[in-house]
Amino acid sequence: MKKSNLKIFILAGGLGTRLKSIISDVPKPMAPILNKPFISYVINNIREYYQDEIYLLTHHKSNIIEEYFKSDSKIIIIKENNPLDTGGAVRNAILELNLSVETKILVINGDTYIKPDLNQFIASSDGQINIITKKISDCSRYNTLSIRENRIEKFNDKKESSRNMHVNLGYYLFNDLYFFKDIIDDKFSLED
């Protein structure tokens, strides 16, 4: 994977409201799976392709994530003071790192595990913004995407979703940062 201008951000700041009754003492990305935090599996998958720094964008119970990864010099924590949603968290990290608009970023949901071929995804992603999706038959539990000719036309709420639609698998590649250049809202979602 060509790394010269690539940064990897993992979204790890959510409240985990649906899992609160099961794992109230840790943030959702730190949910234990076979005695390891879930997010460590995501990071290990990335490290098969990428050896540079990985930025964890945190908020809720950030101290637990910071403590776990404190001895890993390649994990950098960027903490939101207030919850900023997915897009706001990314924008906050871009500003904090003072990234140029030519920088390429891969944003990954810290609570989603898939094993894509990241080299192939990056090499084949020619749009400004690229998202890994999957077409599924039962979309009742998911927000979906309306796609035509490999272009996203719309993000759909669960209420608008029907059968056999694409769902977002939580991997976003921004080939440059022009998308974020003129956004002035601190808090916004990547899916809006």
Spans of model-derived segments:
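Short alpha-helical oligomerization interface
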Residues: S24-P29
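Short, charged, surface-exposed secondary-structure boundary motifs
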Residues: T86-A89, D138-N143, R163-H166
